Structures are given as structure tokens and as C-alpha cells.
Amino acid sequence: MGLEKSLMLFPLLVLVLGLVQPSLGRESSAMKFERQHMDSAGTGSSPTYCNQMMMRREMTNGSCKPVNTFVHEPLAHVHAACSQKNVTCKNGKGNCYKSSSALHITDCRLKGNSKYPNCDYQTSNYQKRIIVACEGNPYVPVHLDASV
């Protein structure tokens, strides 16, 4: 009888694992934001900073991401933007927020003559406010919409 129950439950187990498994290795939007935009320990001061970081953070796999911004502040300062002034996102959604103060950022822009797999970036440092889209519970940044 124990074997019969096991054989009856086996298809159910396979179904549950089939539904759960695809999400196991998936990067959340908040984790992707951190990977693509956070560098709290860095300064972005080297001319090769963007080339190194874009490769290290997997934004040159298969193609060159044209533009990216790294934030050189504690993650808590960036999370704090989600409780600041609400602004409309570039895509028209209403879940964007502007940081209350300027943050140290590095903009990486693909140079005009650069092509995959030799992605070559211009590195520029600024002190600017950032606009982030926030989602979830807890409410955290999931997209860097702009720097102003």
C-alpha cells in the first residue's frame, strides 16, 4: 500500500517541481537593479572603469548595452529615493521617485565606433539626483529611469 501511495503522489510532485523550478535561478528585478547600477565601494574615477564594470556586471554578453549608470552611494541611500518625491517615469507610469539629494554617479556610454564583442565605453562622473522606478514589498528600486 505504501508503494501505491508513492506512485500516486509522484505525478503531483513532478507537477509542483515543474512549476517551481523555473523561478529558482531567476534574478529578481531588485537584484538586477543592484547588479546593473550599484557600486557603493567604487568611485568610477578610472578611464577604463566602464569597460571593466560593464563586462564584470554582464552587460556585454551577446551585445553592448548602449548606456548604463552606476551609483556610488550606500544602497540605503538609493532605497530612500522610493520614499521621496513621486514623478512620472519616462514610460508614463507613476511609480518613479526622485532622490532628495545629488548622488555620486558614473555614466557609461558606448563610443560611436564601438561594436560587439569589443564594447568600448566613455566614462563620465557626475553628482546628480536619480529617478528610480520602485516596486514590491518592501518598496525598492527596480529600474534607473534617469539622472537629473
Curated annotation (Swiss-Prot):
Family note: Belongs to the pancreatic ribonuclease family.
Tissue specificity field: Pancreas.
Reported function: Endonuclease that catalyzes the cleavage of RNA on the 3' side of pyrimidine nucleotides. Acts on single-stranded and double-stranded RNA.
Enzyme Commission number(s) from the entry: 4.6.1.18
Any GO molecular function: nucleic acid binding
Identification of the protein by name: Ribonuclease pancreatic
Disulphide bridges: 50-108, 64-119, 82-134, 89-96
